[in-house]
Each structure stands twice: as C-alpha cells, then as structure tokens.
C-alpha cells in the first residue's frame, strides 16, 4: 500500500506541474516531444499511457524555440527523475504483488521434485519403497493380467509375444524369454503357480527384501526359458525327420508359464531351510529337503521321457538359478 500511495503522489505532482507549465500550447507539445525523444521511446509511451493523465492530442510542433531551452531542460530533468522514481516504485509494487500472491498460493513443486528424484534414483529407489507383500501381489496381478489377455487379445499376437519357442527366439522376439514367465492359459496352471509364488515368495522377500525377490523371479524366468530353448534345440537336432504329420517339431513347440521362476523361489527357500516341514499336494507333510530332491528328480524324469506336457527343462533352469543364489548367499553375497 505504501508503494501504491507513493506512486500516486508522484503521478499527481507530475500532472499538476505539467498543467502549470504547459499554458502555451506550443510549450506543452515541445516539452512532451523533448521528453519522449530523450527517454526510451517504448517505455515512455507505455508509462505515459497507463500512469500519466491523458490529454487531448494536438498537431505536432515542427519548429524549435531556442528561448525555451533552459526551461525545457529543467522540465525534462524533473520528468526524468519522476519517471525514474515511478519505475522503481512500480518494480517494488510488482515484487510485492508477486510475493503476496506467492504467499497466498504456495508452490506446487512437490510433484516435480518427486518425479525428478525418481528419475535420478531410478527403479532401485522405487523398489526400496515397496513392502514384501507389494512385490508378491504385484507379480500375482501381472500374471493374472496376462491370463486375461489370452481371452481378449488375438491368439497369434499372444503366441508371438507371450510364449517361448525357438521360432520366436530366431525371429528376434527376445522379450519372450521373460514375458512367457507371466503367461498362463489353463486356470489350474496359474492357480498352482500363484499359490507357490505367494507362500514361498513372501518368505524370500521377508528375509532378503522385495528387490531380491523380483530379481530372483526374473532370473528364474530367464533361466527356465534358456534351459527350455537348449532342450528343444537338442531335440530338434536329434529327432528323426519325416516320420509323419503327427510328429511335433521341437523347434516349433512353444512353452509358457511361471514354473521356472516359481521353482527358483521355492527351491531357494528349500535350500535355505532344508529341515522345515512342507506339505506335498497341500496335505502330505514331508521334510523340505526330501521334497526338493523329489521335485528335481521328477523334472529329470520328464526330460528323459520327453513326452510330457510339463517342461522339466524349464523347471531345472529355475533349480539352477536357485542353486546359484544359494551359493552366493552362503558366501555372504546377499545381492543377487
């Protein structure tokens, strides 16, 4: 308010002096023309239009009277000082208004700082903010989402992007090494895998953190896919050719499911707690060590028989990842 009052005093005084000294019409226009030419043209017009009192315009003066030079210099100096004071006070007024508005409306920089901080720290910082159950439920929801996609999206699109096979791998669809571990078609398949993921995954996340669990899941998925491809490449190279239309080509046989990833999580928990009691088929109590031996032996048998719809090679890939993770933990390297 003080800045506004001062500006009004300066403007009123300058306007009154202009009227007193500008009785002759020629002098009034002469002074106004001299002031405009010596000060910056754009700024003088701007301030004069918005802050100086308006007066009727007259025809421009084309001649200069030398007798009014001294008087013009004094008036010009007065107006220049008045304009300078007014410009300073105008700046103070703008700053005070900006400060007032800023105090009434606080800065909304939290979201930007939060986003920039997320960019700087990346996924690692984001994962550290998640709880153990958050990661487990997130993996379950991701698997359930792909399960729904099988019933909504085009089947060929799903086979090309959510199933692992030698054809997909040779075609450059390397993302299927991971996406196939989130893919299920049969309801019984996804239910059994998600139950194992929930119970054993919660135990692993509680002991080593959610970031470790996510890395273990992805490593198990990758290990299961690699073992699956190696096994089917071997079968494609050794299988007889031209045995009829009903012989499956191993290079074109696709696979899917989270079994490799879940097997890595489950077997790591078994390796860490071999004397714990687990329940086979949900109601048969057996020592964890015996259950682990039984599961690995059954997968080896599936590979040797070669006619099972369950991929023993993918399960063994998960078991290999679990063994590597267990060895690193034994050496004190908790970061997988």
Curated annotation (Swiss-Prot):
Where is the protein found, in the record's own terms? Mitochondrion membrane
Protein family membership = Belongs to the peptidase S54 family.
Q: Where is the transit peptide?
A: 1-85
Q: Return the EC number.
A: 3.4.21.-
MF terms (GO), sorted A to Z: serine-type endopeptidase activity
Instruction: Mark the transmembrane ranges.
Output: 135-155, 185-205, 216-236, 254-274, 276-296, 307-327
Q: Please tell me which top-level EC class this enzyme sits in.
A: hydrolase
Could you tell me the membrane topology recorded for this protein?
Multi-pass membrane protein
Which keywords describe this protein according to UniProt? Answer: Hydrolase, Membrane, Mitochondrion, Protease, Transit peptide, Transmembrane, Transmembrane helix
| Classification via InterPro entries | Peptidase_S54_rhomboid_dom, Rhomboid-like_sf, Rhomboid_protease_S54
Name-wise, this protein is RHOMBOID-like protein 12, mitochondrial
Q: Which residues form the active site?
A: 259 (nucleophile), 315 (charge relay system)
What biological-process GO terms show up in the record?
Answer: proteolysis
Function description: Probable rhomboid-type serine protease that catalyzes intramembrane proteolysis. Unable to cleave either of the yeast Pcp1 substrates in yeast cells.
Q: What is its main location?
A: mitochondrion
Q: Might you report a single GO cellular component term?
A: mitochondrial membrane
Gene that codes for this?
RBL12
**Does the UniProt entry include the keyword Transmembrane?**
yes
Give the note. The functional differences between RBL12 and the yeast Pcp1 appear to be at least caused by differences in their transmembrane domains.
Pfam families recorded: Rhomboid
């Amino acid at each position: 308010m003080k800045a506004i009052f001062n500006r009004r005093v300066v403007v009123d005084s300058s306007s009154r002096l202009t009227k007193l000294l500008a009785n002759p019409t020629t002098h009034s226009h002469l002074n106004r023309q001299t002031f405009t030419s010596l000060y910056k043209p754009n700024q003088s017009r701007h301030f004069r239009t918005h802050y100086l009192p308006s007066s009727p315009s007259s025809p421009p003066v084309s001649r200069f009277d030398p007798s009014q030079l001294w008087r013009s210099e004094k008036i010009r100096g007065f107006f220049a000082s008045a304009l300078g004071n007014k410009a300073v006070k105008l700046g103070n007024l703008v700053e005070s208004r900006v400060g007032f508005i800023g105090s009434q409306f606080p800065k909304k920089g939290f979201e930007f700082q939060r986003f920039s901080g997320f960019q700087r720290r990346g996924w690692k910082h984001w994962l550290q903010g998640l709880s153990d159950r958050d990661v487990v439920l997130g993996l379950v929801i991701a698997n359930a989402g792909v399960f729904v996609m099988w019933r909504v999206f085009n089947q060929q699109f799903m086979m090309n992007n959510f199933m692992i096979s030698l054809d997909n791998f040779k075609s450059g669809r390397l993302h299927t090494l991971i996406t196939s571990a989130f893919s299920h078609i049969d309801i019984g398949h996804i239910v059994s895998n998600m139950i194992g993921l929930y119970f054993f995954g919660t135990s692993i996340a509680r002991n080593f953190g959610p970031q470790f669990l996510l890395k273990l899941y992805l490593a198990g998925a990758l290990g299961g896919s690699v073992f699956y491809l190696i096994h089917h490449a071997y079968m494609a190279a050794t299988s007889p050719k031209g045995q009829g239309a009903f012989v499956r080509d191993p290079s074109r046989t696709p696979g899917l499911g989270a079994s490799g990833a879940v097997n890595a999580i489950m077997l790591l928990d078994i390796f860490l707690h071999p004397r714990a009691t687990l329940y086979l088929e949900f109601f048969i109590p057996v020592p964890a060590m015996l259950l682990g031996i039984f599961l690995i032996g059954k997968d080896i048998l599936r590979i040797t028989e070669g006619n099972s719809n369950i991929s023993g090679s993918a399960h063994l890939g998960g078991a290999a990842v679990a063994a590597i993770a267990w060895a690193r933990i034994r050496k004190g390297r908790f970061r997988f």
